[in-house]
């Protein structure tokens, strides 16, 4: 496709908001831009920006690919968002007797937005649709005149007509990728959410699964088990990696800038983790499991200024927040 188509909070409240903006917990770096003349029409400029927050355990690696195409009347930016988002997993207390709980990574969100007027718009992105594959692999190719093609696989079927390509490759066992409903020409968002988790051959279960007798059996050990509550969960090694470890996102957004229009604009990149609380409880005859969604949310945002005329990148600032810190 051608890329031009396209209130006050109560003191007694259980929700606390922790704001961490430009603190010692955040570190940033931008590499010098590298220039590559692809051919007589296209020149590629690349720079990488890293930004993280140790307290929230979120790390952004952003690759900015600026494409100057003499055969096209717009600047093109292919932005690859990668890095790491930790699940925040907190194990149960094995000594808990009749009731126990643990926290796990239920969903991860990544978004890219253009914070400017209509001079800079989001015109394409990858993945483009809901995806339930174990491993998501796609290739974006650019050719003369602003033509963008997105194909499955790491080769993407590129041929001699493609002047530039970028790939995404990430694993999401038992999770699925969805596109944010608010996606439009100014913003694109992806969600990677626990979707189909098996429990010793039973299931699949999700964050909202429910049985009238046993509740949500997502991580329940045994409904008649004689173990303590703190030991009656699915063994840790059987819990999906994204639920207890780290998610390594790789998403691509394509932004278009009108030549001779706004010289500078802002781009905002946000990484977020939603942490659920899973519980089990003995009800005098059997164990009952429950999952409580989004009990703790951490969000890390980096805002960059893009100088389209000189092809320069500047970090304006970072913002971090956490609901229910310390759970």
From Swiss-Prot:
Pfam families in the record: Leukocidin
Entry's Gene Ontology cellular component terms: extracellular region
Lineage top rank: taxon: Bacteria
GO biological-process terms attached to the record: cytolysis in another organism
Signal sequence extent: 1-26
Protein family per UniProt: Belongs to the aerolysin family.
Protein name: Leucotoxin LukD
Gene from which this protein is expressed: lukD
